[in-house]
UniProtKB/Swiss-Prot annotation:
Matches recorded under Pfam families: ATP-synt_B
Membrane topology: Single-pass membrane protein
Record protein name field: ATP synthase subunit b
Domain of life according to the entry: Bacteria
InterPro entries for the chain: ATP_synth_B-like_membr_sf, ATP_synth_b/b'su_bac/chlpt, ATP_synth_F0_bsu_bac, ATP_synthase_B_chain
UniProtKB keywords: ATP synthesis, Cell inner membrane, Cell membrane, CF(0), Hydrogen ion transport, Ion transport, Membrane, Transmembrane, Transmembrane helix, Transport
Length: 159
């Protein structure tokens, strides 16, 4: 026996322990470490994906807000254009109505002038006829001043 207490059993146990550690390292620790590294990578990828999702969500929210603003602006523009077109149509209709009214008034005035001239011609003819009749009556009989005045008054009354 050795004074240190190293014997063959201890060496065999030591070699067996080293082989066991080598086998555990090769078949257990390596795959376990790989599984842990894969899990760590998956967790990191998941966190990165969550962060990207957050950023994409913020970007989508920003785009949605921008689209809503653009839609409101477009709606306001459409409303303004519709109001402007409505004013234009109203003014155009008023202008056409004014032109039509002016045309009708001018036509009515022309018709009134024609009717007035026709009435004047008729009256002129009647006055001439009355004067001729009155003159014939005066010439056919002798009249005194009173009869003359009566005839003139009757002629004026007929006018």
């Amino acid at each position: 026996m050795n004074p240190v207490g190293i014997n063959g059993t201890l060496i065999v146990q030591l070699v067996t322990f080293v082989i066991l550690v080598a086998l555990l390292y090769k078949y257990m620790y390596g795959p376990l470490r790989k599984v842990m590294d894969d899990r760590r990578a998956k967790i990191a990828d998941g966190l990165a994906a969550a962060e990207r999702g957050k950023e994409e969500m913020a970007l989508a929210q920003k785009r949605a807000t921008e689209l809503v603003r653009e839609a409101k602006d477009k709606a306001a523009e459409i409303i303004a254009n519709a109001e402007r077109r409505g004013v234009e149509l109203r003014e155009e209709a008023q202008g056409k109505a004014r032109e039509e009214a002016d045309r009708i008034i001018a036509s009515a005035r022309a018709e009134i002038d024609v009717e007035t001239n026709r009435a004047r011609e008729v009256l002129r003819g009647q006055v001439v006829e009355l004067v001729v009749n009155g003159t014939q009556r005066i010439l056919h009989r002798e009249i005194d001043d009173q009869t003359h005045r009566d005839i003139i008054d009757r002629m004026v009354g007929q006018l």
